[in-house]
């Protein structure tokens, strides 16, 4: 027992020991396996984390784009983007987990832990708060899972967990690998949204997320002082600096390879513009912010910027670790960074100092006491306009401290610049460097131009002598009124005229007249631009009198004549028929260009006309007058005010006037200002000013910015133009307006920049430029401002000419922003405007322009004859800074230059360049008169000379009722067409009110038939008096070739001499584009007396509108009795209001050509419309005399045995010809019996052809009796050979009396009707009974709507037919067919007149008419019978179940039209898919001159509304027939009411027109189909017609014949 127990115990111990050993072995094995498995899982976890942290190229590029930002992802816009930016990370973890095996719970746990770490790290940023005052200390935050995390700032302040080596390597990748990509993507971008698109939609979403989440404020980063210890993490980064500096010479952050991007600070919730500072290029354009931003003072950060720059993604980016957001190299800028930036700035400053130290030493001696404002404001303005940054330091004396400017070396400047840059943040440093780079590029242009300024400046006396021989641009006349003839409060004048050396009156623009010392200026334009064409006398100039009153006149040399001058001034004193003549001026002084030429008394007005005072001008005295007399007391008195105005102007612009020349001149525009212009310093200006105050004779050449010694090759081309060369458009405008149109201020394009070699050679060998690219004329000779000499040369007080409400603000050019040539006279305009504003503000009504035109214009120029004050100089120097605000001005002027260049190279045929009401009107008007004077017509001497009262000044007064017999109209110009001139008509009325009888009318040139390509054009001069004036028909207009400079006259001879009371000119009105061929400037002579000279209004080109829309009416009397008599006899006003409202435009026959030909002077071809002589010859065959060789006792009846028909022509088919039926009409009108054996034909039928065997269209079908058909089994068809005979023979058994033929033409289908017979020659027993040209056979209709048989009676051709009388174009008057939509042929001629009735006035089931009448060419009504009228559907009897209705088509011609009885009307059903038709059929071609229609009266809604008229299937008219209104019966019950008829008029006969003028159909407004759509979806639909009516709902109607009782008619 015990032994067994022991053995059991031992056995159990051994087993347990074995189990323990096995267990321990199992434990060791299990631990090893678990450990290995753990290591494997850990390795997989690390791999997953590493893969998740890996960045694709898109992320890497985005991080490089974000470098330099401070991005807050959970700011105001953190939740705007909720879609995941990239789902690849979470998907990857899921896919990786599945790859390792979804059954492994531990691995999935590791994957979730890895993702949880990443998720937690993306949510550690605070919420939506402004991180302005973060403190660098430890914080505790609760994660989303609930645990707390203790966060401390790392020692190295790194933003990620990567080693410095990784940072170095990836920084090298960033700076080297992606440099070109960054340049390409951001070099010229102005916002992040314009970056280069990514390679996938994923990148687009990333970019949008960045844009939406980075809207919050980015505080300025401070630069650490030198005593601060840099962080260790900078060491690795700093190693990259020498490499970059070897390449670029600057710190990497200041180089071209690194793009700095930054958001502007937000201000009170307002979003700010994003601005990119990209790589600087040589000719980069100045960036202009898209909208102004306010500059705020950002709060400096209190902690390291890592916390500020660390951006945690929003919920859409949870899969991205925080460390991957951006790899910033350091927490803040180290001393090495700042020193590198300062070193780069030092390089910029040294380059600038070398440029300016090479100039005259006077540049650096400007005293500091001249500074009116601290330099900080100017620098802020400079950089704000350049980059719109938050704010710069209070003072940045890099280039603004005068001590730096005086230093010969740059050491002190560099040290002070470094001290001034130290408070700046890195971004501000980058931006300042960018500004300096732009300034350097500008300075490069300055240095190229400023070299010639070292030449000695000639004194003003030499320049004055040089100007004497040059072209004088303008003459300045001053009139000083000292007293009047007795009126206590008013003074006035009638007119002032100026005459040149050839005794020709000079044109003076109303805008070139100004006044001084007057509260109300009055209508100054009346002094020089009196409108003598108006019906009443124009107003006379008056104004309140406060002596001395000064009037200023500027007379421009528009033609650039060298002998430009005045010989005489004519002054007409105040005079009105019923006015106070004491208002006239008495004691007057007159100055011409500083010279007193008159000091005396003007005669008082009296009698029937104002008195003239002619004042001669002493030319020698005027030209030799010294400039010493230029200074006036007015200039001295206004000097102080001008200083104040200029200073206020500069302050208004927000620019400082204290910068020395370096800071101002380096931003001068380089496009138009460096073409031969010089830039001097402000210091030189001040020295010159001190001399000018001692010696006023040097006023003409102060050494200011611009008019120093210029390069001869550059300035000389701009002095004057040859006489034979036309000045450019801009130069002509400058001459007219008296002001300089500036050059654009942007960078000069590389194709316009002068080469460096050329600049080094002082520009003496520069290739000449085209005229439109040449430098503008010198301001002193070319565009002297209207107020220059006035201000300096006239006695008394002086003020600018631009004064009063008459000067439109809109005419002030906004191009005057730039002081384009920096000339000394770039100041008078400024002072003039400012003095005008400040001293006369209550008297002006000048609105402030939104573009600040007044302020910009105020600094454009100064006059020669006044010294420039210091404030004025500074104000003018500040204007180059406006180029940053003037980008649109650049584009505007560039467009103008392009148009000018195009105008030089391409001359269009129609050059209507005159916007009415603009100053261009005056300019072009003067140009026309100048051209006509320069090129007098050689034939002008043969014309009768005007009366002597015209004189040389072309001045006249419209006479009252001029008397004469021979009227000559001299056409000076057209409305733009340079090749043709035309008119529609001329109407002349005498003093008795009757139209003047005209015996003859001629023209020179007569018409366009004198040209080689013409000969029968209907547009002849006799059309002018045919009475058809409101027209677009070529048959009623006159057109002649026009050659500028030649004579174009119209001569009209009256039957008897008479007094002319009214002349109406109807201008050329063919179309809107052709209306430019109308006359514009004309002169009228009646028996050599000028009765009119002026402009005729251009026609509208349509047929709508009042008579004034078609030309002009000239009245020669205001007598009411005469005008009333004219009104009664004037057909123009004899139209009722309905007809006027119904005028519709007519379509042109063909579109005019608008393209230029090969030669600019080639005259384009013009062609008239289809006239009466162009009708189809076949339609006029009835006019030929009959050719009949058979004479019988009974006219028209022929007796014979054998009848022969020869078919010689078809209606168009070249291969077949045929007929449907044939009958021979006997003596009694009955058809003669014909048997098949009596018929023979050659060819017999189609079976004669080899390809036909058993064709059914045989000869016997002609007499089978089935004639009204469209089945060809009942027709005859044979092959047709043009030119050969196709004969049908009928052999009667015995001789028959034959009166004619009855034919049914081939009618298989509308297309096959062209196989029908057109011409048939008929002979009987060998004798011809048809005309020589044969009988004209009517073409078949192609349907069976009516019996289309044609009866040819031989007797109708026996009478000799006279051709229709020619239209009397000299005395016939008619009204234009107002309702036509096209050019209708005159009096259409044809066989079948078809009325297509398209719609009714509302009834969907029935349509009807009461009656119709047709009139022939003689105005006689054409008798119609039942054989002539047909309709389809025929009547209501066509309906099922309706019969016996009396409203059949024959009721249309029963001549009972004025009735409401339905038994005399026609009514037909409207059937679905069919158009109701009414046919009027003639057997002979019939000419119709007029058609009268009576609409359906019984039920007006069943009347015809829309209809069309076709003549032989050709549409000749369409319109709308008015509905019959309520009819009023007569006094007696038996009296029928009068039903109004409607007329379609084709004739021009006077009787027709006057008789039917109130019945002509006028086209009212039509209903239209309207669809309103929104985003391609139909919203509403309005249709003019209801849907197809249901035939089942058709109402029954029927009127049967009944015995009529006796009815009385009255």
From Swiss-Prot:
Pfam families associated with the record: DUF4457
Segments of skewed composition (Acidic residues): 198-218
Residue ranges, compositional bias (Polar residues): 188-197
Any one of the GO BP annotations: cerebrospinal fluid circulation
InterPro entries from the UniProt entry: KATNIP (IPR026704), KATNIP_dom (IPR027859)
Residues covered by region (Disordered): 1-24, 84-105, 118-137, 173-236, 305-333, 702-722, 760-821, 836-875, 927-951
Subcellular localization: Cytoplasm, Cytoskeleton, Cilium axoneme; Cytoplasm, Cytoskeleton, Cilium basal body; Cytoplasm, Cytoskeleton
Chief location: cytoplasm
Description of how the protein assembles with itself and partners: Interacts with microtubules. Interacts with 4 subunits of the katanin complex: KATNA1, KATNAL1, KATNB1 and KATNBL1.
Function: May influence the stability of microtubules (MT), possibly through interaction with the MT-severing katanin complex.
Name listed for the protein in its UniProt record: Katanin-interacting protein
Lineage, uppermost ranks: Eukaryota, Metazoa, Chordata, Craniata, Vertebrata
């Amino acid at each position: 027992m015990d032994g067994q127990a022991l053995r059991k115990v031992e056995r159990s111990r051994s087993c347990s020991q074995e189990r323990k050993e096995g267990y321990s072995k199992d434990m060791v094995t299990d631990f090893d396996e678990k450990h290995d498995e753990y290591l494997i899982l850990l390795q997989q976890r690390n791999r997953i984390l590493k893969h998740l942290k890996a960045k694709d190229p898109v992320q890497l590029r985005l991080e490089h784009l974000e470098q330099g930002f401070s991005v807050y992802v959970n700011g105001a816009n953190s939740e705007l983007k909720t879609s995941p930016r990239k789902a690849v990370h979470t998907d990857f973890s899921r896919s990786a987990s599945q790859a390792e095996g979804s059954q492994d719970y531990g691995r999935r746990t590791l994957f979730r832990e890895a993702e949880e770490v990443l998720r937690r790290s993306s949510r550690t940023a605070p919420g939506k708060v402004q991180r302005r005052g973060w403190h660098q200390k430890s914080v505790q935050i609760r994660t989303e899972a609930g645990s707390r995390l203790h966060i401390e700032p790392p020692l190295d302040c790194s933003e990620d967990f990567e080693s410095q080596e990784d940072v170095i390597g990836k920084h090298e990748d960033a700076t080297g690998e992606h440099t070109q990509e960054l340049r390409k993507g951001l070099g010229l971008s102005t916002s992040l949204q314009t970056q280069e698109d990514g390679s996938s939609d994923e990148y687009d979403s990333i970019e949008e997320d960045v844009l939406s989440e980075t809207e919050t404020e980015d505080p300025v980063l401070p630069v650490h002082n030198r005593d601060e210890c840099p962080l260790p993490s900078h060491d690795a980064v700093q190693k990259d600096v020498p490499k970059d500096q070897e390449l670029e010479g600057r710190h990497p952050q200041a180089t071209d390879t690194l793009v700095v991007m930054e958001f502007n600070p937000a201000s009170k919730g307002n979003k700010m513009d994003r601005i990119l500072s990209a790589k600087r290029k040589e000719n980069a354009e100045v960036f202009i912010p898209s909208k102004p931003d306010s500059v705020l003072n950002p709060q400096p950060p209190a902690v390291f910027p890592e916390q500020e720059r660390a951006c945690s993604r929003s919920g859409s980016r949870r899969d991205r670790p925080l460390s991957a957001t951006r790899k910033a190299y350091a927490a803040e800028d180290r001393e090495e960074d700042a020193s590198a930036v300062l070193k780069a700035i030092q390089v910029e400053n040294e380059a600038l100092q070398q440029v300016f130290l090479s100039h005259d030493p006077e540049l650096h001696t400007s005293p500091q006491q001249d500074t009116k404002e601290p330099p900080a404001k100017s620098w802020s303005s400079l950089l704000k306009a350049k980059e719109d940054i938050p704010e710069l330091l209070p003072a940045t004396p890099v280039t603004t401290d005068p001590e730096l400017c005086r230093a010969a070396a740059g050491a002190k400047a560099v040290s002070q610049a470094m001290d001034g840059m130290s408070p700046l943040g890195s971004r501000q440093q980058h931006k300042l460097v960018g500004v300096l780079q732009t300034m350097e590029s500008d300075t490069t242009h300055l240095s190229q131009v400023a070299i010639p300024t070292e030449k000695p400046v000639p004194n003003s006396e030499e320049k004055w002598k040089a100007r004497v021989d040059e072209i004088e641009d303008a003459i300045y006349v001053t009139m000083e009124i000292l007293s009047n003839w007795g009126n206590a409060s008013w003074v006035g004048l009638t007119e002032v005229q100026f005459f040149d050396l050839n005794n020709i009156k000079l044109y003076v623009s109303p805008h070139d007249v100004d006044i001084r010392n007057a509260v109300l200026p009055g209508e100054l334009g009346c002094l020089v631009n009196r409108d003598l064409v108006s019906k009443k006398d124009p107003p006379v100039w008056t104004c309140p009198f406060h002596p001395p009153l000064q009037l200023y006149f500027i007379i421009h040399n528009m033609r650039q004549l060298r002998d430009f001058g005045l010989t005489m001034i004519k002054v007409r004193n105040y005079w009105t028929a019923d006015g106070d003549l004491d208002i006239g001026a008495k004691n007057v002084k007159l100055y011409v260009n500083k010279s007193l030429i008159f000091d005396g008394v003007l005669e008082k007005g009296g009698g029937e006309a104002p008195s003239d005072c002619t004042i001669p001008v002493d030319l020698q005295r005027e030209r030799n007058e010294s400039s010493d007399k230029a200074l006036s007391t007015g200039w001295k008195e206004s000097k102080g005010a001008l200083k104040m105005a200029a200073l206020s102007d500069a302050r208004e612009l927000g620019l400082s006037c204290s910068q020395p020349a370096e800071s101002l001149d380096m931003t001068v525009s380089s496009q138009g200002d460096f073409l031969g212009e010089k830039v001097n310093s402000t210091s030189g200006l001040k020295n010159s000013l001190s001399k000018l105050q001692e010696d006023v004779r040097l006023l003409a050449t102060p050494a200011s910015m611009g008019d120093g010694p210029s390069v001869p090759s550059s300035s000389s081309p701009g002095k004057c133009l040859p006489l034979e060369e036309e000045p450019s458009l801009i130069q002509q405008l400058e001459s007219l307006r008296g002001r300089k149109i500036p050059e654009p201020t942007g960078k000069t394009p590389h194709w316009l920049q002068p080469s460096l070699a050329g600049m080094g050679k002082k520009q003496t060998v520069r290739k000449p430029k085209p005229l439109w690219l040449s430098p503008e004329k010198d301001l002193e000779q070319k565009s002297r401002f209207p107020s220059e000499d006035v201000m300096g040369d006239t006695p008394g007080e002086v003020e600018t000419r631009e004064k009063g409400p008459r000067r439109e603000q809109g005419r002030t050019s906004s191009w005057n922003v730039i002081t384009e040539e920096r000339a000394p006279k770039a100041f008078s305009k400024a002072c003039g405007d400012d003095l005008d504003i400040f001293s006369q503000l209550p008297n002006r009504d000048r609105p402030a322009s939104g573009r600040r035109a007044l302020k910009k214009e105020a600094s454009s120029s100064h006059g020669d004859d006044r010294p420039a004050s210091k404030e004025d100089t500074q104000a003018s120097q500040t204007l180059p800074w406006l180029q940053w605000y003037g980008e649109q001005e650049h584009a505007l002027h560039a467009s103008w230059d392009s148009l000018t260049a195009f105008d030089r190279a391409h001359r269009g045929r129609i050059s209507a360049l005159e916007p009415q009401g603009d100053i261009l009107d005056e300019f072009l008007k003067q140009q026309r008169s100048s051209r006509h004077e320069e090129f007098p017509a050689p034939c002008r001497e043969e014309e009768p000379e005007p009366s002597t009262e015209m004189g040389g000044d072309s001045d006249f007064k419209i006479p009252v009722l001029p008397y004469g017999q021979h009227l000559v109209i001299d056409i000076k110009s057209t409305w733009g067409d340079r090749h043709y001139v035309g008119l529609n008509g001329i109407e002349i009325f005498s003093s008795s009110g009757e139209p003047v009888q005209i015996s003859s009318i001629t023209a020179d040139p007569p018409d366009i038939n004198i040209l080689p390509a013409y000969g029968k054009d209907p547009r002849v001069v006799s059309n002018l008096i045919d009475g058809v004036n409101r027209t677009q028909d070529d048959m009623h207009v006159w057109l002649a070739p026009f050659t500028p400079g030649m004579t174009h006259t119209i001569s009209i001879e009256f039957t008897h001499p008479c007094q002319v009371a009214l002349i109406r000119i109807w201008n050329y009105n063919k179309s809107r584009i052709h209306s430019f061929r109308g006359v514009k400037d004309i002169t009228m002579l009646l028996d050599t007396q000028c009765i009119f000279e002026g402009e005729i209004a251009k026609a509208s080109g349509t047929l709508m509108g009042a008579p004034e829309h078609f030309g002009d009416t000239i009245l020669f009397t205001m007598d009411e009795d005469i005008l009333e008599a004219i009104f009664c006899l004037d057909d123009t006003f004899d139209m009722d209001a309905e007809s006027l409202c119904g005028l519709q435009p007519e379509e042109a026959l063909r579109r005019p050509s608008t393209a230029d030909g090969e030669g600019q002077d080639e005259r384009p071809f013009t062609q008239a419309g289809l006239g009466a002589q162009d009708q189809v010859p076949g339609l006029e065959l009835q006019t030929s005399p009959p050719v009949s060789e058979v004479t019988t006792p009974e006219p028209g009846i022929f007796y014979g045995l054998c009848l022969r028909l020869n078919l010689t022509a078809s209606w168009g088919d070249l291969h077949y010809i045929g007929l449907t039926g044939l009958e021979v009409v006997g003596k009694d009108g009955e058809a003669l019996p014909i048997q098949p054996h009596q018929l023979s034909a050659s060819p017999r039928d189609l079976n004669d052809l080899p390809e036909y065997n058993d064709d059914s269209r045989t000869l016997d079908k002609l007499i089978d009796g089935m004639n009204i058909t469209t089945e060809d089994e009942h027709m005859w068809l044979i092959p047709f050979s043009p030119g050969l005979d196709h004969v049908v023979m009928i052999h009667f058994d015995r001789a028959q009396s034959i009166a004619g033929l009855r034919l049914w033409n081939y009618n298989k289908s509308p297309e096959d009707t062209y196989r029908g017979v057109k011409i048939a020659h008929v002979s009987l027993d060998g004798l011809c009974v048809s005309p020589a040209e044969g009988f004209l056979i009517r073409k078949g209709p192609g349907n069976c709507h009516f019996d289309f048989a044609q009866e040819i009676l031989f007797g109708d051709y026996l009478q000799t037919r006279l051709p229709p009388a020619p239209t009397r174009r000299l005395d016939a008057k008619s009204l234009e067919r107002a309702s036509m939509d096209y050019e209708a042929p005159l009096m259409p001629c044809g066989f079948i007149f078809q009325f297509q009735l398209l719609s009714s006035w509302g009834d969907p089931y029935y349509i009807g008419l009461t009656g119709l009448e047709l009139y022939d060419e003689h105005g006689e009504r054409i008798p119609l019978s039942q054989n002539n009228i047909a309709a389809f559907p025929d009547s209501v009897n066509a309906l099922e179940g309706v019969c016996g209705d009396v409203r059949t088509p024959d009721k249309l011609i029963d001549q009972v039209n004025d009735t409401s009885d339905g038994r005399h009307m026609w009514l037909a059903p409207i059937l679905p898919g069919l158009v109701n038709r009414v046919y009027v059929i003639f057997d002979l071609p019939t000419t119709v001159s007029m058609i009268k229609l009576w609409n359906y009266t019984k039920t007006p809604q069943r009347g015809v509304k829309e209809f069309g008229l076709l003549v032989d299937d050709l549409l000749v008219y369409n319109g709308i027939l008015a509905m019959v209104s309520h009819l009023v019966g007569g006094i007696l019950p038996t009296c029928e009411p009068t039903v109004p008829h409607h007329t379609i008029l084709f004739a021009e006969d006077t009787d027709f027109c006057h008789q039917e003028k109130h019945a002509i159909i006028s086209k009212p407004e039509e209903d239209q189909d309207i669809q309103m759509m929104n985003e391609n979806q139909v919203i509403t639909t309005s249709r003019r017609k209801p849907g197809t009516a249901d035939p089942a709902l058709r109402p029954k109607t029927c009127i049967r014949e009944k015995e009529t009782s006796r009815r009385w008619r009255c």
